[in-house]
Amino acid sequence: MLKIQDFEFVKVVGVGAFGKVHLVRLKSSPTSVFAMKMLDFGEILRQRLADQLENEISILKRIYGCPFVAKLYSTDFHGGKVGLIMEYVGGGELFYWLKKCGRFDEQMARFYAAEIISALRFIHGRGILYRDLKPENILITSTGHIKLIDFGFSVYESENIYMISGTPEYMSPEKLRSEDDGRASDYWGLGVMIYEMLCGDPPFYDSSADAIYHKILESNVVFPHYVSPVARCLITGLLDKNRATRLGTKGICEIMGHPFFKGIDWHEVESRRIEPPFIPNPNTVLSSLASSGELKGTDDAETVVLKPYKHIKHLYKVSKGL
């Protein structure tokens, strides 16, 4: 089992509410790099979020092997911090590339939407609701495909959820009404994502969370003139405020069969054999080190064979000694 001490810390690549995400290098195999999320477990306990962390780790184990989800390889506890050792995905956030481009054309948006749908199909097939679909939670691999990250708000489908959680712009009407949100809420998030990819901003954007919530519950989607009729039809179906009639109610295949995806070979999508619209430039660290043959990422590369850690209950046992 991998330990935190088995890694050399290279640089910080992200900062969150409870810790940092580091780019790390395996000491025994210096050409292999990973992402390590280091969380302050004491703060997690104070915020009463230990159950949420335990749940996230459990879910990442359940969906291990999904080609569109960043893998969790191992967990460790050291010095009052929990380390989640994960697949490093070096192409940056979809959010970054979207803001850099302003908006995507339909071909580009269709590619990413198809891979997101394939990810949701896998996740839902394992009885899990993602519940936080947004461009910041989608990373691009070195070969141009997507990887979903951050399953902190995800839940098992069998659980009853009556709480508001997530990012305001992407919340579904039923979630705002504190109703039990199921797969339909993920399909709502997909609709928001597709709109944002095509238009540059979410459909219900405003300066305050309350104003956003009001628009989600009361306003209709307004499309720029350049959005095609078939794209409007797809987005309108996904952003149906009535989840009982929302596109996808009859199953995710209803979305996959929409004319917007005409010509898409879903088997090719799921096997990642469709050519991505672009290949991202590696970040500065990977670029400088990889050019000398010193470093390569774990995304899309069989560098080290690891198994996900199976005994996550140790977090609770260790916490008693804090």
From Swiss-Prot:
Keyword annotations: ATP-binding, Kinase, Nucleotide-binding, Serine/threonine-protein kinase, Transferase
InterPro entries in the record: AGC-kinase_C (IPR000961), Kinase-like_dom_sf (IPR011009), Prot_kinase_dom (IPR000719), Protein_kinase_ATP_BS (IPR017441), Ser/Thr_kinase_AS (IPR008271), STKc_AGC (IPR045270)
Active site: 132
EC numbers for this chain: 2.7.11.11
SUPFAM superfamilies: Protein kinase-like (PK-like) (SSF56112)
Native species: Encephalitozoon cuniculi (strain GB-M1) (Microsporidian parasite)
The protein's name in its UniProt record: Probable cAMP-dependent protein kinase catalytic subunit
GO cellular component: cAMP-dependent protein kinase complex
Lineage: Eukaryota, Fungi, Fungi incertae sedis, Microsporidia, Unikaryonidae
Residue span(s) of domain AGC-kinase C-terminal: 262-322
Chain ranges of the Protein kinase domain: 7-261
Signal peptide per UniProt: none
